[in-house]
Regions:
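ATP-dependent carboxylate/acyl-activation modules
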Residues: 1-188, 192-306, 316-320, 327-334, ...
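Catalytic core of bacterial c-di-GMP phosphodiesterases, primarily the EAL and HD-GYP domains
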Residues: 311
């Protein structure tokens, strides 16, 4: 994608086996080869997923070490991601590393170009600890990235005079990628200045706006579902918007705004949200059942908060889905294996509450407000954890019995 827009990128080839890696290195025929793990996460270098090889033997050794390895980085979570492919890339003589990205600044309501001389590092850490090291250029969407803005950024990053025009051109090309491919993020980290005074993208990350993919079949063709969270992929197939957050309190909500507010209120009251799950505005009982299946597949989940405001959705339809889910999960016994708190408001709410009340589902509790529901589910999760902890502790040995004369038996 970057090459299509005129950006310089090191030559490289994908490798799925150790032998592929060696053959790719032979094709490159360069004294230095970089072996890179290909996973959808940053921080690979710190986790041992990027190695520099100076011979074919080292390429073979590093490929054998990395392929099949589970890399754990700041972006993968504690479970990590398994490496199933590599990128074998030609090395280059680096003079200096930089950071460059384009993204939408929601507060400024425009695209912003961000640059830093602290390239190759975790930019979030740089922004938190040294915000003065990050330069910004706000871009008028009608004009686009102006030449003077690109050159001002290049000078601000202290590019050598001989490379200023090349750096500015690089920025213009990356902006064209961002706009042309409907990106939500176009990031090059590091963007490097080589000893030959070329400006190249040594590593890059592109995020795309899902709602525009219909006009980018080339991007859709590159999608690798194996790199995606399988529950998130399953949810998408069911018409659900699901994001795994790794906590123990699951939530099911209609509407992205209400879902974010629900996640926030769980966190604010001391809970740990397990997911963001928006069932949308066209929910059916079958969709609610599918949502429950996805949530319950997460073994970390200890409680569920359902927060529904009926508008397009009908509360009675949601309630029917909850009843069906309880029957399915309990094999017809009308109970949930973990506490489920339900807060219903809006369209057909009285009918929805009646359906839940008459179903007599064990482990199902009503709530009249979002905060009450959050507090209740957190309390029940903590009580369950305490019971499990007490059950796991070994019983104290019984005290020795005494005879009438006081002798111990």
């Amino acid at each position: 994608i970057l090459r299509q827009y005129g950006l310089h990128v090191p030559e490289g080839y994908p490798a799925f086996t150790v032998e592929d890696a060696v053959q790719s290195a032979k094709r490159l025929d360069t004294p230095v080869v970089v072996v890179k793990a290909q996973i959808h996460a940053g921080g690979r270098g710190e986790a041992g997923g990027v190695k520099i090889a100076h011979s074919l033997d080292e390429v073979r050794q590093y490929a054998r070490e990395i392929l099949g390895k589970t890399l754990v980085t700041k972006q993968t979570g504690p479970k990590g991601k398994k490496v199933t492919r590599l990128l074998i890339e030609a090395g280059c003589h680096i003079k200096k590393e930089y950071y460059l990205s384009f993204l939408v600044d929601r507060q400024a309501e425009c695209i912003v170009m961000m640059g830093s001389e602290s390239g190759g590092m975790d930019i979030e850490t740089v922004a938190a600890e040294h915000p003065e090291k990050i330069l910004k250029e706000y871009i008028d969407p009608v004009i686009g990235l102006a030449d003077f803005q690109a050159k001002r950024m290049a000078y601000g990053l202290h590019f050598e005079q001989v490379a200023v025009n090349k750096a500015a051109a690089f920025m213009k090309y990356l902006y064209q990628v961002f706009v042309g491919k409907d990106c939500s993020l176009a990031e090059v980290n590091p963007m490097v200045l080589t000893q030959e005074n070329d400006v190249i993208a040594l590593d890059a990350k592109l995020n795309f706006d899902d709602s525009t993919l219909a006009r980018h079949p080339d991007i859709v063709a590159l999608r690798d579902v194996l790199e995606e969270d399988q529950k998130e992929a399953q949810a998408a197939r069911e018409g659900l918007n699901y994001v795994n957050l790794g906590g123990d309190v699951a939530c099911m909500v209609n509407g992205a705004g209400l879902a974010m507010a629900t996640v926030d209120i769980i966190k604010e009251n001391g809970g740990d949200p397990a997911n963001f799950l928006d069932v949308g505005g066209d929910s059916t009982p079958e969709k609610i059942v599918a949502a429950f299946r996805i949530m319950m597949e997460d073994n970390q989940v200890k409680g569920v908060l359902i927060n529904i405001f009926g508008g397009i959705n009908k509360c009675d339809v949601i309630a029917e889905g909850i009843v069906e889910s309880a029957a399915l999960l309990s094999e017809g016994k009308a109970e949930f294996p973990i506490p489920v708190i339900v807060r219903l408001e809006g369209r057909n709410v009285e009918r929805g509450r009646e359906i839940l009340h008459t179903a007599h589902i064990k482990n199902l509790y009503p709530a009249t407000s979002m905060e009450e529901g959050a507090i209740r589910v957190i309390q029940l999760v903590k009580e369950q954890e305490e019971r499990e902890k007490a059950a796991a502790e070994p019983a104290a040995p019984a005290a020795p019995a005494e005879t009438a004369e006081g002798e111990v038996k």
